[in-house]
UniProtKB/Swiss-Prot annotation:
Residues recorded with modification Phosphoserine: S364
Organism: Schizosaccharomyces pombe (strain 972 / ATCC 24843)
This protein's name: Vacuole membrane protein hfl11
Localization, UniProt: Vacuole membrane
Role according to the record: Vacuole membrane protein that recruits ATG8 to facilitate the degradation of vacuolar integral membrane proteins during early-stationary vacuole turnover (EVT) when cells enter stationary phase.
Keyword Phosphoprotein among UniProt keywords: yes
SMART domains from the UniProt entry: Solute_trans_a
The encoding gene: hfl1
GO biological process, one term: vacuole organization
Assigned GO CC terms: fungal-type vacuole membrane; membrane
Impact noted for substituting Y409A: Results in a 6-fold decrease in the affinity with atg8
Length: 426
């Protein structure tokens, strides 16, 4: 690579690194909302990693090839962090699902709107499928990177003496395209379904800034590969040196850094009216950002899906789903309504495998019932609450606490997903 091109890339990368590092340090020094800012800083670090690896590839291709797998993996990780940020803005997964309870389902995005019914994210199983659609790219990307490295080491990645359909490059690229398309489609579906709830948190510039860098990296590489295959980039001179994926990424990084600075500005998290809000020390905040225990636990829960059941995502209010299929699904999982829908309770279910065995052996209509009542636990028990003696001394304190906004004005509750704090807590 020409020295002039290397110097130009270094200048643009230096600007991007300065902007990103200032933004990251500012967040770490004002780490007042760890649940939100953890994901924000992780997203901002994508600029640092992209800029550094792209410049190393321009400066020395062999050195850059060593760090390129980390850049590819972090791209998928940043997409996961953005999804977590949207969830945390809404107060967590349960709050996000409950916020859509009773709302009409949304039409699916093209082209699945012609093939499937409208999507109802108030159903925890539908939410789980969307989340898995987003995270599968994060899970799959490390294996794709390993596959590329192994095929390059063994010399079968893009051999010229083999047909195109037998090329490892073709099949790895096909799996990659399907995976990232599914992930971006699922993320867009989630954003469209909850755009009204996310509106106070300025989701569009955040969504655009994260998606832009991924799209730029992907489509530029695709276009350059096609033009190179057609023999259009076989010339010499500085113009052909500029038409390089890593060179283009270096030149674009300052603009991506500015977009991330605006989208994830510190003013959304550093609220001056929060006089009693503490923050973590700088090193502790950085340690919290680079820790991956939360990612590991969330990935295991999403992969297993055991906690994504109707009982865990049913609102406390007596709201009935807007569509019949939503009520049928909850009823089939043990939810029962009483008093004309004014109250509800859950009953246990038989093991469905046993139900099928009973049906086959007895062939009785009564065996089709897949639910039973728990002995000693009648409907009135669920409706009337727990049976215990009321303490005459404690009850007035509970009644006074219920009249306060947060239970106790000496210890105000600060919601991490509220970007505009009130100046008064009482």
């Amino acid at each position: 690579m020409d020295n002039e091109i290397v110097a130009l890339c270094g200048f643009f990368v230096a600007i991007a690194l300065v902007l990103s590092c200032i933004s990251i340090i500012t967040h770490l020094k004002n780490y007042k909302k760890p649940v939100l800012q953890r994901s924000v800083v992780r997203i901002l670090m994508m600029i640092v990693i992209y800029s550094s690896v792209s410049f190393l590839s321009v400066y020395n291709e062999k050195i850059g090839s060593i760090f390129e797998p980390f850049r590819e993996i972090y791209e998928a990780f940043a997409l996961y962090c953005f999804f977590c940020l949207l969830i945390d803005y809404l107060g967590g997964e349960r709050a996000a699902v409950i916020s859509l309870h009773g709302h009409l389902p949304r039409p699916r995005l093209w082209p699945l709107n012609y093939l499937q019914d409208d999507i109802d994210l108030s159903d925890p199983y539908t939410f789980l499928s969307i989340k898995r659609g987003i995270l599968q790219y994060t899970w799959l990307k490390p294996f794709l990177v390993i596959a590329v490295l192994l095929t390059k080491v063994t010399g079968v990645y893009d051999r010229e003496d083999q047909p195109v359909y037998a090329s490892a490059d073709l099949w790895i690229g096909l799996v990659y395209n399907i995976s990232i398309t599914l992930s971006l489609y699922s993320l867009t579906t989630f954003w469209v379904c909850l755009h009204e709830e996310l509106a106070p948190f300025r989701p569009f510039p955040k969504f655009l800034s994260v998606k832009a860098i991924i799209f730029a990296s992907y489509w530029q590489q695709t276009v350059l590969s096609i033009t190179n295959w057609l023999g259009l980039l076989n010339g010499t001179g500085w113009i052909y040196s500029l038409l390089n994926q890593n060179v283009l990424m270096c030149l674009e990084m300052p603009f991506f850094a500015l977009s991330h600075w605006y989208a994830f500005r510190i003013e959304d998290y550093d609220t001056p009216t929060w006089l009693s809000c503490a923050r973590l020390p700088l090193l502790k905040a950085f340690k919290d950002v680079i820790g991956l225990k939360d990612v590991w636990c969330d990935s295991l829960q999403t992969l297993h899906g055991d906690r994504y059941v109707y009982q865990n995502f049913e609102p406390g209010e007596n709201l009935i789903p807007s569509r019949n299929d939503g009520r049928i699904n909850r009823t089939s999982h043990g939810l029962r309504y009483s008093q004309g829908g004014q109250s509800k309770y859950w009953i246990s279910r038989y093991d469905q495998s046993r139900v099928r065995l009973i049906n086959n052996s007895q062939n009785s209509p009564q065996s089709n019932k897949s639910y039973f009542s728990i002995p000693g636990m009648s409907t009135s028990h669920f409706e009337n609450g727990l049976q215990f003696e009321i303490d005459d001394e404690m009850e007035p304190l509970y009644n006074q606490a219920k009249q306060m906004r947060y239970g106790d004005y000496n210890y105000p509750v600060l919601l991490v997903n509220n970007t505009h704090a009130s100046s008064s807590y009482t």
